[in-house]
Design a protein with these regions (language model features):
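Hydrophobic alpha-helical transmembrane segments of polytopic membrane proteins
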Residues: 19, 71, 226-249, 271-277, ...
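Short, non-helical or kinked segments that cap or interrupt transmembrane helices
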Residues: 15, 24-46, 60, 88-93, ...
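Membrane-interfacial amphipathic/re-entrant helices at transmembrane-helix boundaries
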Residues: 1-20, 48, 60-63, 89-94, ...
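Helix-loop-helix "hairpin" substructures at the membrane interface of multi-pass membrane proteins
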Residues: 13, 135-215, 239-245
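Membrane-embedded helix boundary and interhelical linker motif in transport proteins
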Residues: 8, 30-77, 81, 86, ...
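Transmembrane helix-bundle core of multi-pass membrane transporters
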Residues: 85-86, 91-162, 189, 255, ...
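Inter-helical junctions in multi-pass inner-membrane proteins, predominant
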Residues: 1-16, 159-164, 190-230, 254-265
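Alpha-helical transmembrane segments within multi-pass membrane transporters and channels
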Residues: 24, 57-101, 108, 244-249, ...
Length: 293
């Protein structure tokens, strides 16, 4: 049963990566930008939830909703202040700005909450289930995380395909200039994309901290990077690709820790990225883009 247990844990961890990767893939697919500060929004979401529960005594569900709202606002503010002026700038300028925003959020959290790691109280009180006569136990956090990932991916897919806002996102992703000529509010659409991505980061942050109950100003850094790897793995810009890439990456990481070495697990994850880029640079669901001259 140990292999099945590792597999389930890998799917759970991969579900968190998938939710984070959705933020990367949406922003890149629509705004054609890589928001490398996305991982730190995870940390902000965790701290908002932590503070709401410990200092304000809020119910866990209310604290999670507050966290999602706070990160939604944060995402829009970051887009307006940091990224909107750089839409016509070089990718290097956007990258440098993203790193600057990341350091700003980390140091702001360091100033407010200090460097000590906080013990995060899980927002999920469900104990989980036992299978195979008690030989296989699946925690409540694992079940909720996997279910949340499925619901988010399905909901986001339906939102994009069946709502006017979603159709506007598709139009902007295809041709921003043509979308603007058709009367679509490009600025509002891009801001909405950042808002949704940041709200998802908040949810991912809460799930991550519930599974691994610790929180500090750098909590989101490595999960953010791994989620970017997952987005590239699945094909950045593709929602199904983000989900598949995240889950595969989570399984690879957990199995590497279990059967190879916990110290080498991160190296193996990044080695997978290198192999994918060599074999299929566009990722599993990525499409080749032909430049017309």
């Amino acid at each position: 049963m140990s292999f099945i247990s590792y597999l389930i844990n890998g799917i759970s961890l991969g579900s968190v990566y998938a939710i984070i990767a959705l933020g990367y893939t949406m922003v890149y697919g629509i705004a054609k930008m890589l928001n490398f500060a996305h991982g730190d929004v995870i940390m902000v979401g965790g701290f908002v939830t932590f503070t709401a529960m410990t200092s304000a005594g809020m119910h866990p569900l209310a604290a999670v909703l507050l966290s999602a709202v706070a990160c939604t606002v944060l995402g829009v503010v970051i887009e307006r202040i940091a990224y909107k002026p750089l839409r016509s700038a070089s990718p290097l300028a956007v990258l440098i700005t993203a790193i600057g925003v990341s350091y700003f959020l980390q140091n702001l959290a360091l100033l407010i909450f200090g460097a000590d790691t906080k013990t995060f109280q899980s927002v999920i009180s469900f104990d989980g289930i036992s299978l195979a006569g008690g030989q296989l136990k699946i925690s409540g956090v694992t079940l909720v995380t996997i279910a949340a990932c499925i619901i988010i991916v399905v909901g986001l897919t339906l939102f994009i395909r069946r709502t006017k806002a979603g159709q506007a996102m598709l139009a902007v992703s295809e041709d921003r200039g043509a979308a603007q000529l058709m009367g679509i509010n490009v600025n509002g659409t891009i801001a909405l994309t950042f808002a949704i991505g940041s709200a998802l980061a908040a949810i991912a942050g809460v799930l991550l901290c519930s599974a691994y109950p610790s929180l500090n100003p750098y909590t989101g850094s490595m999960p953010g990077i791994k989620a970017f790897v997952a987005a590239v793995f699945g094909g950045i810009g593709s929602i199904p690709g983000a989900m598949l890439g995240g889950i595969l990456l989570g399984i690879i990481e957990i199995l590497a820790k279990a059967y190879i070495s916990s110290q080498l697990a991160d190296a193996i994850v990044f080695a997978v990225l290198i192999v994918v880029l060599l074999v299929k640079p566009t990722g599993i669901f990525g499409k080749k883009i032909q430049e017309k001259v």
